[in-house]
Regions:
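Ankyrin-repeat boundary/"N-cap" motif
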Residues: 1-6, 29-49, 71-80, 103-112, ...
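Mid-chain, structured segments of secreted extracytoplasmic proteins
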Residues: 10, 14, 18, 22-24, ...
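Ankyrin-repeat intra-repeat helix-capping/turn positions
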Residues: 11, 53-54, 85, 118
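Short coil/turn connectors between adjacent alpha-helices in alpha-solenoid helical repeat scaffolds
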Residues: 50-51, 55, 162-166
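Ankyrin-repeat-protein effector appendages
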Residues: 65, 96, 129-134, 138-196
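A short, hydrophobic/aromatic-rich structural module that often spans a beta strand
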Residues: 68-95, 101, 105, 116-117, ...
Length: 196
């Protein structure tokens, strides 16, 4: 773990600022492991600051010193902020160059990730912010690279025991239909049949 990431990790703002002012690279990837060396995790300081226990000041400081909000060598900062539904951090990242439609290392976008997590309210909000619900990707879940928001909506419907009366879910389905998506959504149905 880099000194910079460690300073962020320990919530030491003064040291974070000192290191950046003295040449620390905000885009240096740290590789570390929790329990065994076989389970490594890559992390960038900007990603860490997007988790819920950090104020905006850390993120602002890193971006002021050249942190790249679209660096895919670790989890994208947008994904970390979305995990905690931190709309303020998401908006700030977008204002400072984050690409809302950037694929991560497994070819998912933040809106695909939130659809997978069934966070329908955040999916709608991200769509309003410019996320493309039909951008298709995904390589990590046996989906054949067919993942998009419609795919995960159909998956939710196929599951058979969700809250289909959720107002945000209903809005999302209606909005997808308004752009020409038909349910049942064929790519998700095809994949279900292939896996049976």
């Amino acid at each position: 773990m880099s000194y910079l990431l460690y300073a962020v990790w320990e919530h030491n703002y003064d040291m974070t600022k000192f290191l950046l002012e003295n040449g620390a690279d905000p885009n240096f990837v740290s590789v570390f492991w929790d329990e065994t060396p076989e389970e490594t995790v890559c992390m960038l300081p900007l990603e860490r600051t997007c988790y819920d226990k950090y104020g905006m000041n850390y993120m602002k400081l890193l971006l002021e010193h050249g942190a790249n909000p679209n660096d895919t060598r670790a989890q994208l900062p947008l994904f970390a902020a979305a995990l905690y539904k931190d709309k303020q951090k998401i908006e700030y990242l977008l204002e400072h160059g984050a690409d809302i439609n950037q694929f991560d290392s497994v070819k998912e976008t933040v809106i695909i990730d939130q659809a997978l997590a069934r966070q329908w309210d955040l999916v709608l909000w991200l769509w309003d912010k410019g996320a493309d619900p039909m951008k298709t990707g995904g390589i990590g879940r046996n989906t054949g690279g067919k993942e998009n928001v419609a795919y995960w909506v159909q998956d939710f419907i196929n599951y058979g025991n969700g809250d289909y009366d959720n107002p945000d879910f209903k809005k999302l389905v209606a909005r997808l239909k308004s752009i020409g998506v038909e349910f049942p959504y064929k790519p998700a149905m095809d994949n279900t049949e292939e896996n049976e």
